[in-house]
């Protein structure tokens, strides 16, 4: 009987302990190798790159936050609502997206607090995920939070964050400087007038560098709703008659030049596949006319898009914009969610990758052209060593893009580095790409990459495959040299 009482007491004590919020702290050796000897090397390498400026050549931060420089509205707006990395896992466990403020615009204080409570209540969902790593880094390093999020601690943390967000030191421009961002690229529609970028560039109180990226996807995807109106608008913006194929091409060329005049260094393309089969000019003109009339078949629409992607590579050889390909995603996999909440709200799913044959027409024409830089991104790990590394290991124009989206996680990044390095080394890679909409995750994401690369290089030193001086040079080059070269920064 006494034993039963003792077990009951222990159970009650454990329940009480679990009900109390734990402390939140970051281990200085997080993500570094577990072996002490290798870890010592990694520490030295990481120390050398830890505080280097951040180069972010591809991402989705809204530049208006830096122009307006108004305080972030609330913790939910900053940490939860716009970040599908955060919302999708809660949705998978039964939390409706509308309960997280998705697609609702600015939230009331009551609604924002309720959204924040949901994140804290579901904190255990993120164990072992990169989202947990980024969020903890933000909370501790930027905002000084010392209590682990939970249902019990949610309101206290919310109040702490809200108080800090009201201070000048936590406005977007102050954080931009604090994060040591040297270049931040946004992603922009070809019809955008880039007025925000121009206003930032002309602001004498602003010393940062924010540049646009040309993203023409919607103008190449004939089946998308509103495509005829979109290409008509494209023509209006640049003074071209887009009622014919040649005018459509000329409009794209004109807008690319406009973007370049506002600082753009790259054009980003995200399609289901990376096919680049050429069409005869007469056939392209015929299909384009059918597309405007609404009579193009699905096969014709794909053929026109693949031909135009080849044309985009041709344009890059002429205007110098780095061409990045993010392919292999089924967008809007759950149509009801896509219709209700819009794109980029968590319902996109990866597809198998295929690069070798689909890119052959492009690479046979332009793969050795001195002006083309082509960065390939995939969500299919099986092509890292089978296709991407061999392509980048032959064609001077091709670079292997950093793991992206579902793969920008510690173990996936380690697998990527191991899969490609023996074929292409380090110099045929893009440098780290954060690709984020969540502004405050930028330093956490780049720090994660620097730690992982330091660990990988430390292993090579420990195995006597590199000396430490070479490893140090490589660590610095991955942070600074690679993105500067690949994106012409």
Regions found by a protein language model. Give the residues of each.
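Cysteine-centered motifs
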Residues: 5-7
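Divalent-cation-assisted or electrostatically stabilized phosphate/pyrophosphate-binding catalytic cores
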Residues: 353-356
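C-terminal amphipathic alpha-helical interaction region
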Residues: 323-325
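Hard-cation-handling environments
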Residues: 334
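Short, basic/hydrophobic alpha-helical segments
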Residues: 361-366
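Active-site loop ensemble at the mouth of alpha/beta enzyme cores that anchors a bound cofactor
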Residues: 338-350
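Metal-cofactor-binding active-site regions of metalloenzymes
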Residues: 15-319, 368-382, 389-489
